[in-house]
Every structure is written in C-alpha cells, then in structure tokens.
C-alpha cells in the first residue's frame, strides 16, 4: 500500500469538518462560490496518507475518478500546510471554507497533538477539476505513457461501480 484515504458522504451523516464551519457544508460551498449542491453530491476526504508525491498523484486521480463515477460534484477536505503544498504541486485550486480550529471541537476530538500547529483549513473543489488536474499533472510528468497507471485506475474504478 502506497497511499490511503477515508471517504464520507455528506448524505450519510454530518461531516467531521462541519464542526469547523458556522453553517452546513452545502451553505458554506454556496457562500464560497462553488454553487449549491445537495448533500448527496458532497463528499469529505480524510486521513490522507502517502509514501510519496507520486503515490499522492495516483491517489488523487483514483479518488477523483471514483467520485465522478459515484456522481459526487464537490470534494471537501481539512488540509494542513503540508497537504496544501502537495495539492498545489498538482495544480489543484481549492477554495478555503474556514480555518480548522481545535476550540470548535469537543471531547477527545480536540486532542490531536500538534496537528493544529500546522494551520489546517477546510477546503473544497469541484470533483471534475480534481480529476482534470490529476490527469494534466500525470501527462506533464509522462506518468500515463510510462506506466498506463491512470488508464488502469479509471478502468478499475468503472469496474467497481
């Protein structure tokens, strides 16, 4: 395993990142200019981990393909400075919805060690933009021609649907 991510549909339960927002995620997205979307079209990514930037690229491409296949319109994530730098390497233009502050949480959820020292932000982007950015970056890096990885990811995601 080179990378992993958790995914939560907004239609299933409140998103963890909604604790950082002053309003429901669908209202925050509309206020940020990302359009009005039903909760069934919104997804939260969490617990992202990768061994390398290349593994992150594959993960982003796979998740974007999966989210498109499942009909999600907007992806949300709480990203630290480091994660935002990784996203910027892939030319992902994310909208900031709010700062993620420990004081917005209650109980054990507040006790994340030094996590909040890395300036986490609640971010969002259209799923179509995420996939396009990942494909463009892979093309620029000549990844897909060397290994066929992106084509393989898309084919595998379609088989899962």
Residue ranges and their predicted role:
Residues 1-40, 95, 122, 128-131, ...:
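A conserved beta-strand-loop-helix scaffold within acyl/acetyltransferase catalytic domains
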Residues 71, 93, 112-114, 131, ...:
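Alpha-helix boundary/capping detector
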Residues 118-145:
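C-terminal helix-cap and adjacent tail motif
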Residues 70-73, 140-161:
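Short, cationic low-complexity segments
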Residues 5-8, 85, 89-127:
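Active-site/acyl-donor-binding loops of N-acyltransferases
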Residues 17-107:
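Acyl-donor binding region in acyl/amide transferases
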Residues 36, 116, 146-148:
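Glycine-rich, flexible loop segments associated with nucleotide phosphate handling
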């Amino acid at each position: 395993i080179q990378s992993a991510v958790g995914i939560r549909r907004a239609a299933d339960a409140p998103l963890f990142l909604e604790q950082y927002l002053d309003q429901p995620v669908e209202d925050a997205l509309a206020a940020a200019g990302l359009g009005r979307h039903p909760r069934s079209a919104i997804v939260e990514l969490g617990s992202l981990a990768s061994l390398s930037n290349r593994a992150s690229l594959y993960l982003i491409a796979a998740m974007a393909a999966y989210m498109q296949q499942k009909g999600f319109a907007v992806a949300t994530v709480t990203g630290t400075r480091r994660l935002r730098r990784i996203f910027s390497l892939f030319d992902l233009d994310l909208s900031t919805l709010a700062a993620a502050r420990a004081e917005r949480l209650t109980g054990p959820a507040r006790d994340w060690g030094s996590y909040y020292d890395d300036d986490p932000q609640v971010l969002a982007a259209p799923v179509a933009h995420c996939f396009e950015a990942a494909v463009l970056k892979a093309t620029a890096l000549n990844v897909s021609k060397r290994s066929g990885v992106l084509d393989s990811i898309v084919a595998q995601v379609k088989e899962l649907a």
